[in-house]
Amino acid sequence: MPAKDDTSSDKEKSLELFLKIGLDERTAKNTVANNKVTTNLTSVINDAGVTDGCSRTVGNLLYTVATKYPANALPHRPTLLQYIVNSKVKTTAQLDAALSFLSATGSENLDLNKFEEACGVGVEVSTEDIKHAVDEVVEENKATILELRYRVNVGELLGHVRKRLPWADAKVVKQLVDAKLYEILGDRTAADNEKPKKKKEKPAKVEDKAAPVATSEKPLEEDLNPYLIFPNPEDNFKVHTEVPFSDGNILRCCNTKALLEKHLKATGGKVLTRFPPEPNGYLHIGHAKAMFVDFGLAKDRNGGCYLRFDDTNPEAEKKEYIDHIEEIVQWMGWEPFKITYTSNYFQELYEFAVELIRRGHAYVDHQTADEIKEYREKKLNSPWRDRPISESLKLFEDMRRGFIEEGKATLRMKQDMQSDNYNMYDLIAYRIKFTPHPHAGDKWCIYPSYDYAHCIVDSIENVTHSLCTLEFETRRASYYWLLHALGIYQPYVWEYSRLNVSNTVMSKRKLNRLVTEKWVDGWDDPRLMTLAGLRRRGMTPTAINAFVRGMGITRSDGTLISVERLEYHVREELNKTAPRAMVVLHPLKVVITNLEAKSAIEVDAKKWPDAQADDASAFYKIPFSNVVYIERSDFRMQDSKDYYGLAPGKSVILRYAFPIKCTEVILADDNETILEIRAEYDPSKKTKPKGVLHWVSQPSPGVDPLKVEVRLFERLFLSENPAELDNWLGDLNPHSKVEISNAYGVSLLKDAKLGDRFQFERLGYFAVDQDSTPEKLVFNRTVTLKDSYGKGGK
């Protein structure tokens, strides 16, 4: 019998460990299949000290910690685990509250009193307390309960009880609510078990009014001002952060009265923010949130937002990316206060570095990258850390003048190598690179790091609010340490959660692979979540900004937002702005035998569902001729009760035109392939069939309708979170793009221009693509309709 490989053995050990903590077998096996969650859960179990097992209740809470713990608060995870194993945090509600509190706290010092208060530690809720709350909630909702009986939304009732008693045992709450309902209503009747009847709709109703999917209800944040949480510039005198040092000292960073007064005099008290992309790739939907935060706050407070290119790496910058970023920022509806480059400040940054050395806060180091990594892991000082200031000044000048080889020296900040925060491990301020800079030319051969430059430039530009995503929170200490060391103005820093959208990847490295390895058709491929891709797909900046606003500016990290929420906002926008038209993707010829070839009837089709009869601009003309085309999928040889398309001997309505009845089917020699349908129309319109089909027709005898190409897009990845997969490229959806080259459209479309958007009835919303030519238009499907006609043979 062959020996098991190490991987198989490790998985068996992990499975055994997970079963010990009470996970059910299915959950345990699914966890083992996910390397990231396996690593996290194993670490949590070890840190909690329960490798020999624990109760199922504790195990389930540990599993939640492993999958949902906020990355910005890792220093506090051991504390939470002890609260769990000691049964101080013992319910899901308590754990959710604890995770929320820790996410807001981040890497700052944890106030245990506030933590315990926030998650209900020590709060005991008796059964009598729960019974009293249930009685109150049921009484308040009694009229609804009596009307709907057992069809009442029990979840809402439970929610009302939870608001009164957030730490109550959920099982007990459910049992008491069920008992109270039985007390009032008695046994269920047959009527209670019937599904509520829905109002019957016409089968071919066009999507007149888009509604959100069940998972995408319009959140309250959209109706609030998301910028109310930010302080005014004149209030920027409080302690920004505390930086604990390994020797026991604590640095409390804040602006002096003189620094704040100087800043306010320079700005006139205006809010100034900055949007600082690195020009090394195309912006994606995550940047849309950053723009909404940075530009949005400035606009809300009548201030200004810099568009600042963080171009400290001369090898990564491309003019293509700079041009794209400027253009896409404008397309998103934002107007920069000024466009600046970090390289504009290279001279000032250099002078600040010299001053930092003079103050004893920086030194020239000769360690290699590997040595720096090793010393950081061991928390050891560099051998050159305590060299004389004069020596570092001379060597830094030699670095500037090009006298030292690339890789032989760096300038490092003298922070705290024994700190608990790895972002205080003597970060590099300057590196040598003998590479001309695209913006600054060949003046410099030393370039500042992001950690050194961005906070100083924030101060130079008098930025009032420096806003960034949560992964930068641990850098807050080094940010303020540097500004304090130089004695210059300190902006207010605040971190918010990244925007993570399902069924896509957004890391620049992964996006670059998709593009360079030709998995997609460039940075603006409509399947990508780049802003260029979303624009090409037909999405509007209004819809994208509404989506971002709906997410709110929160600190809850790690949440994966369903792409359906974005699609909801897109439908809401396009439903109001996209005129209707008809396109047949897979045409099936229908010959109207009781209409002469040259006797086409002109009919009015609506551009808008609420078009008024006296408004000619709300309609377009289409000919109803003796040759029309319907979707091939709207015809069947065998009719059925629940089918609303066309079949032999059956009638349907051609939208805006007449009822037609199939009288004959012409088959090919194989007796299977349908070549054409023959039908008669009812000029009196007395026939009232249920099915309504979209269609196009020959504009004149023997002349085909307008031929167009249509591209249908689906999710680029099959999994909700492909970024978590080891073989993420293997998760690509092979059917994410379907090209239909010979679709037919109504003549209304012939003058459509790049970017024009339409609702193709029963098919979805579409936009004109840049690949269109005078000979042939190309349309991209932006989103499907909320519902298709359903009964139209689709």
UniProtKB/Swiss-Prot annotation:
ATP binds at residues 278-280, 284-290, 469, 498-499, 506-508. The keyword Nucleotide-binding applies. It comes from Lupinus luteus. Residues 192-217 are annotated as: Disordered. SUPFAM superfamilies: Nucleotidylyl transferase (SSF52374), Ribosomal protein L25-like (SSF50715). GO terms for biological process: glutaminyl-tRNA aminoacylation; post-embryonic development; reproductive structure development. The lineage of its organism: Eukaryota, Viridiplantae, Streptophyta, Embryophyta, Tracheophyta. This is Glutamine--tRNA ligase. CDD domains: GlnRS_core (cd00807). It comes from the Eukaryota. Its EC number is 6.1.1.18. The keyword Aminoacyl-tRNA synthetase applies. GO terms for molecular function: ATP binding; glutamine-tRNA ligase activity. Keywords: Aminoacyl-tRNA synthetase, ATP-binding, Ligase, Nucleotide-binding, Protein biosynthesis. PANTHER family: GLUTAMINE--TRNA LIGASE, GLUTAMINE-TRNA LIGASE. It catalyses: tRNA(Gln) + L-glutamine + ATP = L-glutaminyl-tRNA(Gln) + AMP + diphosphate. It is an enzyme of class 6 (ligase). L-glutamine binds at D310, Y450. GO terms for cellular component: cytosol. Belongs to the class-I aminoacyl-tRNA synthetase family. InterPro entries: aa-tRNA-synth_I_CS (IPR001412), Gln-tRNA-synth (IPR004514), Gln-tRNA-synth_Ib_RNA-bd_2 (IPR007638), Gln-tRNA-synth_Ib_RNA-bd_N (IPR007639), Gln-tRNA-synth_Ib_RNA-bd_N_1 (IPR042558), Gln-tRNA-synth_Ib_RNA-bd_N_2 (IPR042559), Gln/Glu-tRNA_Ligase (IPR050132), Glu/Gln-tRNA-synth (IPR000924). A motif ('HIGH' region) lies at residues 277-287. Pfam families: tRNA-synt_1c, tRNA-synt_1c_C, tRNA-synt_1c_C2, tRNA_synt_1c_R1, tRNA_synt_1c_R2. A motif ('KMSKS' region) lies at residues 505-509.
